[in-house]
């Protein structure tokens, strides 16, 4: 398949000795952006198993999930963890991650997936849109060369994952004869859930290890989350995000032009809240 013929990048391709530590060491907002992302990516194997179970019998999908998607997501986690350890070595990543994983595992349940395979592929497209947007914005938000390189590599991977999920979606949509109203419902619902349990869980456990005295301070954690969201919102590319969100609807160009503005408003007020 396209995108898999060329060799995927390796963590060894990143020269962590080039990190401009003095440039990012005191940037707490950046620390939380990178550390929380490293937790979520590192827990990808939990979610992969649920998806493999859900799509069991479709060897093309399950093979790609296990051999490509999961491996690349876990690599993202390892690379982000390595970056955290180089810049903030005092942060007890392993201890904090164990706490995160124990809670995160309770959110990864097959019964929480969409009711049909086509709709779950729709949801996957939304999630990949969110992650690609996150890492693109992270890359734009910093001038530190190693993080910029890493975030750009991850964003490129997420776009490639989106393309695979979208292709699988089209196959299942044809089989299920899915109408646009159901697709739109899944896009809206999954977009609303993008900043739900996993992101909140990651931030809480990073705070618990980084600033234990603030671990129970809901207002402080909310402020952190708001600053992180502001960074993403300031540095994203709305047009690209909007195009990715709308693509599963497969609307005629004329209709797409008409509904683009309200969907963009929805994206800005909910997806980026």
Predicted regions and their residues:
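Non-heme di-metal
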Residues: 1-273
């Amino acid at each position: 398949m396209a995108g898999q013929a060329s060799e995927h990048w390796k963590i060894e391709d990143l020269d962590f000795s080039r990190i401009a530590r003095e440039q990012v060491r005191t940037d707490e907002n950046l620390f939380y952006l990178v550390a929380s992302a490293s937790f979520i990516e590192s827990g990808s194997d939990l979610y992969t198993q649920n998806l493999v179970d859900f799509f069991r019998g479709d060897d093309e999908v399950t093979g790609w999930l296990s051999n490509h998607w999961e491996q690349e997501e876990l690599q993202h986690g390892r690379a982000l963890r390595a970056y955290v350890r180089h810049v903030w070595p005092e942060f007890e990543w392993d201890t904090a991650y164990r706490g995160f994983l124990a809670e995160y595992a309770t959110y990864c349940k097959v019964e929480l997936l969409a009711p049909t395979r086509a709709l779950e592929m729709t949801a996957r497209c939304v999630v990949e849109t969110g992650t690609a947007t996150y890492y693109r914005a992270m890359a734009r938000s910093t001038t530190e060369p190693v993080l910029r390189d890493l975030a750009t590599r991850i964003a490129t991977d997420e776009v490639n994952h989106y393309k695979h999920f979208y292709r699988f979606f089209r196959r299942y949509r044809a089989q299920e004869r899915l109408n646009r109203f159901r697709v739109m419902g899944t896009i809206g619902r999954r977009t609303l859930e993008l900043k739900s349990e996993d992101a909140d869980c990651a931030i809480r456990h990073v705070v618990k290890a980084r600033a234990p005295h603030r671990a129970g301070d809901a207002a402080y954690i909310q402020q952190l989350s708001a600053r992180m969201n502001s960074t993403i919102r300031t540095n994203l590319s709305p047009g690209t995000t909007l195009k990715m969100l709308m693509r599963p609807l497969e609307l005629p160009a004329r209709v797409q032009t008409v509904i683009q503005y309200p969907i963009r408003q929805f994206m800005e007020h909910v997806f980026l809240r």
